[in-house]
């Protein structure tokens, strides 16, 4: 018998859903009764999320082109989000966090009448914004440093509902060295996989300052198998930082052109680049409306 | 479960993996790894909750509940002073323990004007560090010099103490305030040091160090042997009687107070004849000189390579040919013997057989040089909040010694003043007690031990009190099966 999903409120009133490795922080705005209905619906949906994923886990850990057709809606979201990138190595697991957030936010938003709602799954955020409202997402320059360097304001007119961040030092392994890549996209699953892939490309290739390790040595069940993931990053020259960012920017631009993402911020050692409709100069304590 | 998974199970168990049952993923965890949640790991083939007794960081006032495990049983239950009337509580025991534990890396905080933050870690702050005492008089760097690890600043050289150099490492600014990389380097160094593993440090403009709790420091590649027995003047006082008959003059060279035997009170009392020796530096009181040498990595931990550098010509009216001079460091590790020639110039000669024991006596009375590491951390409001309805009562109770604070079962010193800021000798804390979250922050155990009566008087959550036997059964059943110690 394994542990069940847990639903609890943080002391500030936000909802915390946790099961195994999944932690969701959820906040709804609206009438108390509507919030309560939405929280109940999301908690109820969450109860079976991990069990559903586990049933298909073996398939979801394979390269997306070799994954079985998915049964659960979350697994389907994962496959849909990742199969767009069949020209490089990616498994549906690259979109797992965003897909869970998308599923839960969808349940909450449709269960009652809310003004706004967000579901934050470890930095991968799905949200919905009602008319006249806005959701403000803080932007950081590193996945492990919560200092804000900017804010993204999303209104009901935004055609984006997902933001995700990936980088070296976070929970997931990366082939790259980005401190943080934040991607804005139409849903959290799309943002999640794009952030992962762009972060993989913020790279100097084989480099003496970048130590790597086989992914399955640090996590035996890693979907990345024996591929080499970054284990430490030493001192980099200004030029090396810019080169690595250039490589990521190129990847992000291609995604923007294809329309799979709306925009991205890439950060490495204090240098920040942006791709999309905004300028970097807006970043520092700036307001990027969307 | 499909059949093929069962086959996998047998194969994987063979490799020393354990299967976690904490959630439906049921990870197979290889030795020394954690499952996909990072909350459970395989420690020596035993499935182990990786959370220490509690999480020692400030989780901000909001959303800061953490639910620890009550007992790091395999490591220290034999040592802790637990009587049947005593409950051990971790912080946060009022929540739905033990099933519910927000992982430290998702504990969230609110930023003004921001709904949510797109970062793996939300608002974790760490208030902890280590104070390092390195038993050496060698110069490791100027006070206030930065101490670097992995090329990043993680602390500084603090004010020197008796026979030792002090480092102050970590602290909230180094963990969170400078750059991500310096925070990570700080976190790694702190964790390694607290876990009693060796860490390489570089003092800016100073020495390279390899330090490890409970072992001799390695300074610029040389392992330090002895802590000095006292300053130069004190050494003269201690050993004057033994020198009286075998030499005419002794200079105990010391960066702080260099001692000269015949001028010193000890020599005077013994009626020793003034030698006419003249030292550079500044005479403080008879036989006690300041500023003779600077700290360094040369002769006897000073900046000189030849002790004669500190001598000026002997006074011809007082000195005499054949005068026997011993110059020795405060640990006895450096010693030279001279005899004045007809021109009153000191001529280097081997240490005579009757002088050697007096030098050895200095070393014999020195203690071995060690590195000692004290972990210092503060238990803020959120840590206390889970324990009682009124956190301040817990603080007062600690002040009144009604509640005993321990760190992994080890005794702590509680700083006067606000909060519960404690210091603990890391060598007394069981191995594996310290960890980290990538925030970066250090995770360390802390226990509050209080009698049931006082616990309830504190406004403690009575319903949360559980019998020790229940806790052990519920949380450590696998340990109980594996560790024969507990079934005896």
Can you say where each PLM-predicted feature lies in the sequence?
Chain A
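Conserved glycine-rich phosphate/nucleotide-binding loop
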Residues: 11, 17-20, 132, 141, ...
């Amino acid at each position: 018998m394994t542990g069940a999903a847990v639903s609890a409120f943080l002391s500030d009133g936000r909802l915390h859903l946790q099961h195994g490795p999944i932690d969701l922080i959820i906040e709804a705005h609206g009438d108390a009764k509507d919030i309560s209905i939405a929280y109940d619906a999301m908690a109820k949906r969450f109860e079976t999320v991990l069990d559903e994923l586990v049933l298909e886990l073996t398939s979801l850990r394979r390269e997306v082109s070799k994954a079985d057709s998915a049964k659960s809606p979350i697994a389907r979201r994962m496959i849909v989000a990742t199969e767009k990138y069949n020209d490089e190595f990616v498994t549906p697991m690259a979109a797992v966090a965003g897909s869970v957030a998308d599923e839960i936010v969808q349940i909450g938003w449709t269960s009652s009448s809310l003004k706004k709602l967000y579901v934050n799954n470890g930095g991968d955020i799905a949200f919905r914004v009602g008319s006249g409202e806005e959701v403000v997402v803080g932007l950081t320059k590193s996945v492990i440093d919560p200092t804000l360097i900017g804010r993204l304001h999303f209104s009901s007119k935004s055609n984006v509902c997902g933001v995700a961040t990936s980088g070296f030092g976070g929970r997931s392994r990366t082939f790259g060295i980005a401190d943080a890549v934040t991607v804005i996209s139409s849903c959290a699953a799309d943002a999640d996989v794009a952030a992962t892939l762009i972060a993989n490309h913020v790279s100097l290739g084989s480099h003496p300052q970048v130590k790597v390790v086989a992914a399955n040595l640090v996590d035996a069940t890693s979907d990345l198998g024996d591929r080499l993931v970054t284990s430490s990053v030493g001192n980099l020259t200004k030029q090396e930082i810019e080169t690595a960012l250039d490589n990521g920017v190129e990847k992000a631009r291609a995604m923007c052109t294809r329309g799979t993402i709306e925009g991205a911020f890439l950060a490495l050692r204090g240098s920040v680049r942006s791709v999309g409709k905004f300028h970097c100069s807006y970043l520092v304590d700036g307001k990027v409306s969307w | 479960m499909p059949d093929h998974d069962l086959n996998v199970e047998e194969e994987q168990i063979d490799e020393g993996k354990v299967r976690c049952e904490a959630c439906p993923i049921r990870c197979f965890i290889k030795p020394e790894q954690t499952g996909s949640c990072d909350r459970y790991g395989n420690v020596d083939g035993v499935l182990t909750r990786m959370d220490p007794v509690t999480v020692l960081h400030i989780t901000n006032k909001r959303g800061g509940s953490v639910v620890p495990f009550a007992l790091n049983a395999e490591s220290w239950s034999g040592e802790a002073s637990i009587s049947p009337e005593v409950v051990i509580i971790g912080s946060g025991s009022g929540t739905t323990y033990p099933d519910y534990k927000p992982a430290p890396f998702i504990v969230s905080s609110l930023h003004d004007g921001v709904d949510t933050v797109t970062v793996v870690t939300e608002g974790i702050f760490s208030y902890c560090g280590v104070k390092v005492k390195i038993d050496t008089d060698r110069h490791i760097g100027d006070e206030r010099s930065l101490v670097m690890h992995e090329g990043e600043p993680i602390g500084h050289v603090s004010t020197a103490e008796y026979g030792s150099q002090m480092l102050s490492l970590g602290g909230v600014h180094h963990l969170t305030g400078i750059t991500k990389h310096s925070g990570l380097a700080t976190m790694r160094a702190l964790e390694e040091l607290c876990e009693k593993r060796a860490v390489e440090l570089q003092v800016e403009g100073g020495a390279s160090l390899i330090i490890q709790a409970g072992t001799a420091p390695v300074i610029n590649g040389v392992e330090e042997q002895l802590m000095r027995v006292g300053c130069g003047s004190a050494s003269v006082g201690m050993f004057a009687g033994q020198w009286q008959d075998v030499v005419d003059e002794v200079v105990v060279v010391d960066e702080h107070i260099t001692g000269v035997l015949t001028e010193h009170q000890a020599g005077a009392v013994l009626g020793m004849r003034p030698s006419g020796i003249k030292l550079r530096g500044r005479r403080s009181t008879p036989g006690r000189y300041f500023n003779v040498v600077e700290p360094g990595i040369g002769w006897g931990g000073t900046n000189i390579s030849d002790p004669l550098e500190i001598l000026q010509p002997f006074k011809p009216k007082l000195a005499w040919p054949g005068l026997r001079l011993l110059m020795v460091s405060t640990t006895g590790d450096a010693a030279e013997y001279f005899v004045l020639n007809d021109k009153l110039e000191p001529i280097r000669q081997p240490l005579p057989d009757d002088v050697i024991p007096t030098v050895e006596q200095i070393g014999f009375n020195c203690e071995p040089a060690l590195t000692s590491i004290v972990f210092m951390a503060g238990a803020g409001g959120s840590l206390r909040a889970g324990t009682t309805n009124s956190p301040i009562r817990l603080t007062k109770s600690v002040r009144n010694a009604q509640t005993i604070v321990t760190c992994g079962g080890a005794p702590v010193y509680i700083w006067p003043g606000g909060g519960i800021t404690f210091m603990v000798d890391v060598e007394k804390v069981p191995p594996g007690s310290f960890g980290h979250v990538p925030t970066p922050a250090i995770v360390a155990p802390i226990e509050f031990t209080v009698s049931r009566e006082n616990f309830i008087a504190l406004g403690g959550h009575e319903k949360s009190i559980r019998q020790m036997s229940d806790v052990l059964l519920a949380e450590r059943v696998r340990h109980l099966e594996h560790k024969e110690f507990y079934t005896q």
